[in-house]
Every structure is written in C-alpha cells, then in structure tokens.
Design a protein with these regions (language model features):
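C-terminal engagement/docking regions of AAA+ P-loop ATPases
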Residues: 52-56, 63, 298-395
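Conserved C-terminal "switch" segment of AAA+ ATPases
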Residues: 58-65, 69, 79, 219, ...
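Pre-Walker A (pre-P-loop) alpha-helix and adjacent loop at the N terminus of AAA/AAA+ ATPase modules
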Residues: 63-100, 105
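Canonical AAA+ ATPase core
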Residues: 146-150, 175-179, 187-278, 327-329
Length: 395
C-alpha cells in the first residue's frame, strides 16, 4: 500500500515514487521534468513542481525515528544541562554508525555525557583514561600464558577495555601517537587484531574521544589518519549563566537525577539502516561534492581563501559525513530526502577536523571554522551558478 507525502527535495517541494519493478525511483514534476534512475541510467532536468510517493511503512518508520530520538534527548537532558548542539551531534554520529571527537577544557561534562548516553541506550560502557605511559596492549588486550588443569601452558587472549559498545577515550591527546593509533583498526573495521588473530567487536560500537585544546601542555596532536576516522568533531564550550545555575541546583542539592533506558543496541542498528535509505537527490549530492572539492587547495573548485590558508583539504570521508549527517537531519525535520539546508547545518562538525591549515593561517591566527564558513558562503547550491560565484570570489 502506498501513501502520498508532501516533502522537499533539496529545498524544492517534491514527492518520490518508488516502483518495485526494475528498482526504479522517479521524481516527477507538473511540467514533466524530473529525475529518474533505472537500468543504470540517470537523467536530471531541474524545474517544475515535484510530487513524491512513499511506501506507508517507510513513512511510519521515519515518524517513529523522530519520536524515539526525542525520547533519548529527553533522558539525556535530565542529567546534562545545556550543550544542545553537542548532544545533537553525538546522537547524529551514533545513528550513522560513526565516531565522535569532543574538544573542550576539563570539567565541562564530556565524560558525564558519554556515561549518560550509555545508560540511556543500555549499552556496555568502558572508559579508558589516556596517559603518556599508556600502551596499545592496555587498550586492545594481549595474549597471556595460561596453565590448564592438566599442567599444560597455552596462550589465551585477554580482551582489553576496547571490547565494549561505547568506548570513552578520555583525554586521548595525552597519550603518545603510538598509543593513539591503537584505535585505528577498531574505529574503521570494528575489529582488533592481536598476534595475527582477528577479534570482532560487538555492534553497535561507538568511540567517543575527548581531548583538551592542543595548546595545553602535555598534549600530543592526533595523527591525521585517526582524526579523519572521527565522523564529527564537536567543540564543547562553557555553560552560560542560566545553565551554570541549573548545574548547581542539580549537583549540590543531594538528589542527582538519573537517565533511564529508552533504547537498546538492536534498535540502534535498525535506525542506522533507516538513515541510509533516506534519498540523496543528484543536485544535493553534487552540492556535497562541490563543497568538499572546494576545500582542496590548487584544485579546480578551490576558492581564493582555500589556496591562501589551507595546506590539505577534506578526504572523501568528509563528503560521506556530509551526506549521512544530512540524512539524519532530514528525518528529524520530517522529510525523507536531504535538502541543501541539511547539508549546511552539518558542514562545520563534519569538516573542521579534516582540513589542515598552512603556516600563513597559523601565523595570522586563522581557524579552520573561519575558512570553512567562507567556503560555505561562496559555494552556490546550484551548479549553474558557478560562473557567477567564481566572478564574485575573484572580485
């Protein structure tokens, strides 16, 4: 059974019809324009009024996702005061199967947020305190020589604290780069290899790392390969006057509220699959591609500010993060397709850790967010506006 749902496709009112025969999707407009995919061919002709048809179960699942997301936010809000954007970013990472890097000075509630999240989602939780003397085996585990009842000796793998579902890597940049890199395989593959034997981690597996600002003493910058594996980098700021007063009321009155379980692992995996079913139309996909390419200095889509202040641009993981996070945002806005605004909203947390500033930017005190905001402002939504945008950028 099909039902009809009015939505917006990349900022345009639209409706999508999924035809079971031939795996065909079609976007149709009143003027006969639109985009269709079938038989390995794609055709996009913008213009006209679009109408979309969604299968009823898909629409119901999207509405249920919004309701369940709100339930998780409510429980976290019982413990965590403020930091609305940070909580939203953390949950976005969770529902796409990504990992999250939180940056902020000590004492802002980063660890409490992770612990509350694990309690709300009924997931196994381990905390690893990163220190300069921490070794990779302390994280991953190691083979131990064990003696059997018969008196024989054999190697037995003793799992490390990373064998959990929510792993808090606390103050990750206080450990040496060798130890930091121990998480590379676990974050990308969801496995741990010790002495040639691969061990699977239970799903969902979510790494949330916290780090202090890199200018503080006793910190080591994360390797670029590891930073790129974090889906989002979120900046945790200070609480304002009202939030700080609420924190005092909650933590000094003797009764600290607790979050209760409202979701579990299998349900999270279900929502992760739903997110990937959200439609990314070709013109929105092209916008994601052009935004990512605009961060590449000396590239064909590079802007003047890119060439001036960036040494390296975003990897393809940045484009993947924009698309997937945009899909979560679309579901939360009641749509089953990604719009330009969805992409813009997640642009900074998805790319701020994936661009590397050059010496000139560092000398002038330019931050990555400043460069990215300028790119976001100058890259047009529609590809046919590129010549005008290029002329404006040069001027």
């Amino acid at each position: 059974m099909d039902c009809r749902l009015t939505a917006r496709l990349g900022g345009v009112p639209c409706e999508v019809r999924r035809e079971s025969s031939g795996e065909r999707q079609r976007f149709r407009g009143a003027a006969g324009t639109g985009w269709s995919r079938g038989g390995g061919k794609e055709d996009w002709r913008p213009g006209g009024e679009f109408f979309m048809s969604l299968e009823e179960p898909i629409q119901k699942r999207a509405e249920e996702f919004r309701r369940r997301y709100a339930a998780v936010r409510e429980q976290i809000g019982r413990v965590i005061v403020g930091h609305e954007e940070v909580v939203h970013g953390v949950l976005t990472c969770l529902f796409v199967g990504g990992h999250c890097l939180l940056e902020g000075v000590p004492g802002l509630g980063k660890t409490l947020l992770v612990r509350t999240l694990a309690q709300t989602l009924d997931l196994a939780f381990n905390r690893i305190q990163f220190t300069p003397d921490l070794m990779p085996a302390d994280i991953l585990g190691t083979n131990m020589v064990m003696e059997t009842p018969e008196g024989r000796r054999r190697f037995e793998f003793q799992a490390g604290p990373v064998f959990t579902q929510i792993c808090l890597a606390d103050e990750i940049n206080r450990a040496t780069p060798k130890t930091q890199s121990a998480l590379l395989e676990t974050m990308q593959e969801g496995t741990v290899t010790v002495a040639g034997t691969k061990h699977e981690l239970k799903k969902p597996f979510f790494v949330m790392a916290t780090q202090n600002p890199i200018e503080q003493e006793g910190t080591y910058p994360l390797p670029e390969a590891q930073v790129d594996r974090f889906f989002f980098k979120l900046l945790v700021g200070y609480s304002d006057r009202e939030e700080l007063a609420a924190i005092l009321d909650r933590t000094t009155a003797g009764l600290i509220p607790e979050a209760r379980k409202v979701m579990d692992g299998p349900e999270i995996l279900q929502w992760q699959r739903l997110v990937r079913e959200v439609i990314l139309a070709p013109h929105v996909r092209d916008y994601v591609v052009r935004l990512t390419l605009a961060t590449h200095p000396k590239g064909p889509f590079a802007l003047p500010i890119t060439n001036q202040f960036l040494r390296w641009g975003s990897s393809p993981r940045g484009a993947q993060a924009l698309a997937l996070a945009g899909k979560v945002q679309a579901l939360l806005e009641g749509r089953y397709n990604v719009s330009f605004e969805d992409v813009r909203r997640v642009f900074l947390p998805a790319l701020r850790h994936r661009v590397i500033l050059n010496f000139e930017a560092q000398a002038e005190g330019i931050e990555a967010d400043q460069v990215l905001l300028d790119i976001l402002e100058k890259v047009p939504e529609k590809a046919d506006a590129l010549p005008a945008a290029a002329a404006l950028a040069e001027g």
